[in-house]
Amino acid sequence: ELIAIIPAVHPVAQKAAPPGEPLATLDLNEIRYEPFVLMDRNSTLRSLCDQIFARSGFQPNVLFESNNTAGIVSLVKSTICCGIVPWYYTRIPSDELACFRLPGHPSWDITVSYPTTGYLSTGAREFIRLASKWWKTIQPDQI
């Protein structure tokens, strides 16, 4: 799921849920005039963000573009902009961020495919097993 992140010092941050509680939902129009840092315009994540903003009825003021999602989080923590990132990057609470779900709970599904009729090495089979196990452990119980 994609999550809106804003600096904890932003006035809208007071609407965030307390730590340990499910995230509150934020209408992006509440921060429509704020600068944003988003993924590079050629990325899949940016395409999804552009669709989210279009559904919200505005185009964001993009202050920075990045190829690094963790970099987006760092820029938001520095209090100069807002961002949208996958939930994974917000799973550890931070006093510097306020995190919100978005209306409709947009998500980015990641899939891996491999031929079931072809040969898979022991290493490839082990990678599939470990990746599957890892992704199952990071799924949020409650966002």
What residue spans do the PLM features occupy?
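Short loop segments at secondary-structure junctions
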Residues: 7-11, 116-118
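Secondary-structure junction motif
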Residues: 19-27, 34-56, 120-128, 135-143
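Residue-level "edge-of-site" marker
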Residues: 44, 66, 88
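Short beta-strand-to-loop elements that line the ligand-binding cleft
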Residues: 38, 59-68
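A short, charged helix-loop
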Residues: 12-19
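Beta-alpha-beta core module
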Residues: 1, 23-26, 30, 70-119, ...
